Structures are given as structure tokens and as C-alpha cells.
């Protein structure tokens, strides 16, 4: 399916690019999240009329993300979980838990923005987690998992 991107999408393209993607990706993710539209003649003409407005909105989002990124970059947060004597957690700390922790600290972060390269945290100690505030703004946050011996 041919689509026109309404914002920058990682690994796909920038604002205004016309790209071909699989139908399911377009119908189930890009179009419902208002990241893209079908690339019909009418949609392309309408996009060209709104291009300046969309570019201004994209620049504002990027600036806001960079401002939040400067505050968030390098910060450390603590989370307490029940653990065994060997340092393994009963359960794990997931990206949803990290997003909740950041929301309590005053940062608007969604679960999908938290990237954990090694998967959920299952051991006590300090772990570095990436937070993708924008496709161009990715910051590192340290999560210190403290064990609560059961």
C-alpha cells in the first residue's frame, strides 16, 4: 500500500515521504495513529496545502522532546521489588513499570517509548534503559533495582 507520512517514522521515512508498506502495518498502526494517510491524488494535494503547518508542528514536538530529554538524560530512579537471596527478582521490572515510575516523577512517557535492550530487568542492581521521546531524541536513564528480601 502506498502511504504518505504525516510525521517522521523510525526506519521508514520523514514527513511528506511517499512510501510503500505492507497493508497490515498501514491499516493497523500507521493510519489509526495518524502517522500516515493513503497516498491518493486527493490526499497528496491536501498534504501539500498543509505541509508548512505539519512541519511547524513536527518542529515544535522535536523541541519539546529535546527539552524533556535534557532534563531526563542521565537521571537515576529507584524501584523496589521482592527478591530472593541470590539477587534474582520474583517477577521482573518491565517497560510499563519504568513508564509508571517516570510518570510519578513528572515525565510524560508512554510504555512503548521505554526500550529495554536486554528485556525486562530480573536482577538487583543498576540497569541502563533507553527512553525514546521522539524518533530523534533517545536518552539513557538508570534504573536502580533494590531487592526486598522475602
Swiss-Prot record:
This is Large ribosomal subunit protein bL9. HAMAP family: Ribosomal_bL9. GO terms for biological process: translation. Coiled coil: none annotated. Keywords: Ribonucleoprotein, Ribosomal protein, RNA-binding, rRNA-binding. GO terms for molecular function: rRNA binding; structural constituent of ribosome. InterPro entries: Ribosomal_bL9, Ribosomal_bL9/RNase_H1_N, Ribosomal_bL9_bac/chp, Ribosomal_bL9_C, Ribosomal_bL9_C_sf, Ribosomal_bL9_N, Ribosomal_bL9_N_sf. One of its GO terms (cellular component) is ribosome. The keyword S-adenosyl-L-methionine does not apply. Belongs to the bacterial ribosomal protein bL9 family. Binds to the 23S rRNA. The gene is rplI. Transmembrane segments: none annotated. It comes from the Bacteria.
Amino acid at each position: 500500500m502506498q502511504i504518505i507520512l504525516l510525521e517522521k517514522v523510525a526506519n521508514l521515512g520523514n514527513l511528506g515521504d511517499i512510501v510503500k508498506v505492507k497493508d497490515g502495518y498501514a491499516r493497523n498502526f500507521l493510519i489509526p495513529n495518524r502517522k500516515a494517510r493513503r497516498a491518493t491524488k486527493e490526499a497528496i494535494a491536501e498534504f501539500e496545502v498543509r505541509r508548512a503547518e505539519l512541519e511547524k508542528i513536527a518542529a515544535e514536538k522535536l523541541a519539546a522532546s529535546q527539552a524533556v530529554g535534557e532534563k531526563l538524560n542521565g537521571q537515576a530512579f529507584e524501584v523496589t521489588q521482592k527478591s530472593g537471596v541470590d539477587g534474582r527478582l520474583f517477577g521482573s521490572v518491565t517497560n510499563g513499570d519504568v513508564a509508571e515510575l517516570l510518570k510519578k516523577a513528572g515525565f510524560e512517557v508512554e510504555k512503548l517509548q521505554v526500550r529495554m535492550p536486554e528485556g525486562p530487568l530480573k536482577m538487583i542492581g543498576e540497569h541502563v534503559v533507553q527512553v525514546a521521546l521522539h524518533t530523534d531524541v533517545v536518552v539513557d536513564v538508570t534504573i536502580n533495582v533494590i531487592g526486598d528480601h522475602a
